[in-house]
Each structure stands twice: as C-alpha cells, then as structure tokens.
Curated annotation (Swiss-Prot):
Its EC number is 2.4.99.28. The chain crosses the membrane at residues 10-30. The keyword Transmembrane helix applies. NCBIfam families: mono_pep_trsgly. GO terms for molecular function: pentosyltransferase activity; peptidoglycan glycosyltransferase activity. Pathway: Cell wall biogenesis; peptidoglycan biosynthesis. It is a single-pass membrane protein. It comes from the Bacteria. It catalyses: [GlcNAc-(1->4)-Mur2Ac(oyl-L-Ala-gamma-D-Glu-L-Lys-D-Ala-D-Ala)](n)-di-trans,octa-cis-undecaprenyl diphosphate + beta-D-GlcNAc-(1->4)-Mur2Ac(oyl-L-Ala-gamma-D-Glu-L-Lys-D-Ala-D-Ala)-di-trans,octa-cis-undecaprenyl diphosphate = [GlcNAc-(1->4)-Mur2Ac(oyl-L-Ala-gamma-D-Glu-L-Lys-D-Ala-D-Ala)](n+1)-di-trans,octa-cis-undecaprenyl diphosphate + di-trans,octa-cis-undecaprenyl diphosphate + H(+). This is Biosynthetic peptidoglycan transglycosylase. The keyword Transmembrane helix applies. It comes from Agrobacterium fabrum (strain C58 / ATCC 33970) (Agrobacterium tumefaciens (strain C58)). Belongs to the glycosyltransferase 51 family. GO terms for cellular component: peptidoglycan-based cell wall; plasma membrane.
Length: 226
C-alpha cells in the first residue's frame, strides 16, 4: 500500500468518525433506544464491566432532576444546547488571566459522554459544541435529560442514576430524598473523588446549597417537570 492510499484511508476513516455522531443523534431520539457512553464502551473493551440500569425519566425522583439542573445547568430550559452568555464569560476570564469555571451545559456533557472523550482540550470542545446544538435541536428536553441521567458517571463503573442510587444509598432512583439527590448532583463534576455516600464537610455544604436552590427552582425546570 503506497502512502497516498494510506493517507486517503486515514482521512476517510476520520471523516466517518466525525459524521457518525450526527447520524446517531436522530436514532437516539427514539424512546426505545438506550445509548451507551464512550466510557462504558471503554470499560467493556478493557474487560472491566460496568453497572448501568436504564430507567425512564418518570421513574426518577423529581428532586434529583431539580438538583442536577440547579447544579449543572440552571438555564437548561432556555438555551439551545450552549449557554452563550456563560461561555462568553468564561472566555473573557481566560483571556484576562482570571480563574474560570466550566461552562458545559447538560447537552454539552451529554454529547461528550456519548461521542467524545474525557479530558480538557480545545479540540474536544470544538467537536462538542456543534454536537450539543444538534442534539438539543433534535431531542426534546425531556429526552435529553433522560439520556443524560442514564449515561452520567457516578463512580468507577457506575453509570446512570439508577445504578448510582442503588450503589450509594441502596434505594431506587424514584425514592431519592432531597439531600441524597443534592449529594448525587454535586458529585457529578468529579464522581471519582466526590463520593455521594461518603461526603466530607465541603461536599455537605455544597449539597445544602443545591438542595435549597432545587426547592426554589420553579419555572427553571418546567421543560422537564411540567
């Protein structure tokens, strides 16, 4: 095989990998499809296995939905996949040399979980943004939340809220209390180091804040809990 043929095959493979997620997004809109994340696939390939028990949105405690939205994406019901105001603020702070916090919305996190890889990079973010916009356009907000809560990582080999609720609190996701829901929500950014069932003082304080915000969430969660 000459260099030109090899280069052509590599380019075609990369193009196929770039296009594939956009073909899967409308497929994942179908309610009977249960997507898996790239981390789950990695666990399978490395023979580690994982625990994920898919549950429909109606079988998940509304307290958990409220807590996750208030912790991860308070504008979920109002943006089209990307919170451009928050994104602009993060970019401005970065250019000024100030510390920044993430601007990843729930659609962006879902796109990353389903199609991309962990770790911060401009390349991943550049791929993530259009995928989030496409998914938010094709899926309903309820479907987006259902997929997100069923593929999110909540510990080593623990994926989805049902497996998380059973692993950390020995109860189904439908029966999570306000505090349990808040603890699971605030552990999402770093589920390996933040253990919902063994929270330190800092995690307890953060969970208390999210618990209060969840109680007052009102119209902020209407697109999912109407």
């Amino acid at each position: 095989m000459d260099f030109r043929t090899l280069a052509k095959r590599i380019i075609m493979t990369l193009l196929a990998l770039l296009i594939l997620p956009y073909l899967l997004i409308p497929v994942y809109a179908l309610p009977f499809i249960r997507p898996v994340s790239t981390l789950m696939l990695a666990d399978l390939v490395t023979l580690q296995g994982y625990d994920r028990r898919w549950v429909p949105l109606e079988d998940i405690s509304p307290r958990l939905v409220q807590s996750v939205m208030m912790s991860e994406d308070g504008q979920f019901c109002f943006h089209g996949g990307v919170d451009w105001n928050q994104m602009q603020s993060v970019v401005s702070n970065a250019l000024d040399g100030a510390s920044t916090r993430g601007a990843s919305t729930i659609p962006m996190q879902t796109a990353k979980n389903l199609f991309l890889w962990n770790g911060r990079s401009f390349l991943r973010k550049g791929l993530e943004l259009p995928l989030a916009i496409a998914a938010d356009f094709v899926w309903s907000k309820k479907r987006m939340m259902e997929i997100y809560l069923n593929v999110a990582e909540w510990g080593p080999g623990i994926y989805g809220i049902e497996a998380a609720a059973q692993h950390h609190f020995k109860i189904p996701a439908a029966k999570l209390s306000s505090r349990q829901a808040a603890l699971l929500a605030v552990s999402l950014p770093n589920p390996i180091d933040r253990v919902a069932s063994k929270p330190g003082r800092g995690l307890q304080r953060l969970a208390g804040l999210i618990e209060r915000r969840a109680r007052a969430s009102g119209g902020y969660v209407g697109c999912v809990l109407d």
